[in-house]
Swiss-Prot record:
Record's GO cellular component terms: cytoplasm
Main location as per UniProt: cytoplasm
Cofactor(s), by name: [4Fe-4S] cluster
UniProt-annotated binding residues for [4Fe-4S] cluster 1: C46, C51, C57, S294
Entry EC number(s): 2.8.1.8
Main EC class the enzyme belongs to: transferase
PANTHER family reported for this sequence: LIPOYL SYNTHASE (PTHR10949), LIPOYL SYNTHASE, MITOCHONDRIAL (PTHR10949:SF0)
Domain Radical SAM core positions: 58-283
UniProt record similarity statement: Belongs to the radical SAM superfamily. Lipoyl synthase family.
Pfam families cross-referenced by the UniProt entry: Radical_SAM
Annotated compartments: Cytoplasm
Protein name: Lipoyl synthase 2
Length: 300
């Protein structure tokens, strides 16, 4: 980054509204989690994505583990996660390492997510299941939510392959199945390169088809240039496929290489969006500037 680029990015950070600034949490809680994660050479999206809520979540005994390495095979224009080069081979011991970390941290609720791994035979679906099994062996009282990619691409690409991979995870019975559509239909192309809006809806629809008892969840980030009408359309699309839970948060630009923020939505606007979502029938809604997809997940 050049000096002028650095100055530009610093000015953008300075211009962020006050409601997006908050303390990160107790240093002792952060360092404990970071030490255990580093010792086991595993990853959390809390750290890789620099989540502003990680201190609060750690204090509430929740965390979101990032499976299959920190490098994604896709190049979404909003995401902080590493991308642009070949990902690492899978660690066959990762499930056990995550289970041990859950035990040491005394976590009551765990979210498992992953980078997209289009290079793998089953996109990593079996790795999710293996990790869930390992966690349950050591932590039988811990609930597990999954936040998955769309499982499209690679060998066996297409609807049948996607269905088979999702079925594998549904049969492992997560406490909640989350897949984020991230943005409105019009902006999916520029925001989520390599993803398709209807393909993401299909993920959540398949979960309900395979097991209607499993709660489904999705998330939207605002600030890309969407309108309220487009957000209502997206929420309607989610309700039409039986999606139960919704999170809405503010997009914050991680670097100059990412999409610029078009608008900072106010807390009052988030309250309005949350009210609309609840009126549509979502059973659990989190809508606020700093909300992320796993925010207060254990309270749902």
């Amino acid at each position: 980054m050049t000096a002028s680029q650095s100055a530009q990015f610093k000015s953008e950070i300075t211009a962020m509204p006050s409601w997006l600034r908050r303390p990160i949490g107790k240093a002792s809680e952060l360092s404990t989690v970071q030490r255990i994660i580093k010792q086991r050479q595993i990853h959390t999206i809390c750290e890789e994505g620099r989540c502003p809520n990680r201190g609060e979540c750690y204090a509430q005994k929740t965390a979101t583990f990032l499976l299959m390495g920190p490098t994604c095979t896709r190049v979404c224009a909003f995401c902080q996660v590493d991308k642009g080069h070949a990902p690492m081979p899978l660690d066959p011991e990762e499930g056990q390492k995550v289970a041990e970390a859950v035990q040491l941290l005394g976590l009551r609720y765990v979210v498992l997510t992953s980078v997209a791994r289009d290079d793998l035979q089953d996109q990593g679906a079996s790795h999710f299941v293996q990790t869930m099994e390992a966690i349950r062996q050591l932590n039988p009282g811990t609930q597990i939510e999954v936040l998955t990619p769309d499982f499209w691409g690679g060998a066996g690409a297409g609807e049948s392959g996607q269905r088979q991979r999702i079925k594998m995870i549904v049969e492992a019975q997560p406490a909640c199945f989350n897949h984020n559509i991230e943005t409105v239909r019009r902006l999916t192309g520029p925001v989520r390169r390599g993803a398709k809006y209807d393909r993401s809806l299909r993920v959540l629809s398949l979960v309900k088809e395979l097991n209607p008892r499993i709660p489904t969840k999705s998330g939207l980030m605002v600030g890309y240039g969407e309108t309220v009408a487009e957000l209502v359309e997206a929420m309607t699309d989610l309700r039409n496929i039986g999606c139960d839970r919704l999170t809405i948060g503010q997009y914050m630009r991680p670097s100059l290489e990412h999409l610029p923020v078009q608008k900072y939505w106010t807390p009052e606007e988030f309250e309005h969006l949350g009210k609309l979502a609840r009126e549509m029938g979502f059973s659990h809604v989190r809508s606020a500037p700093l909300v992320r997809s796993s925010y207060h997940a254990g309270e749902e």
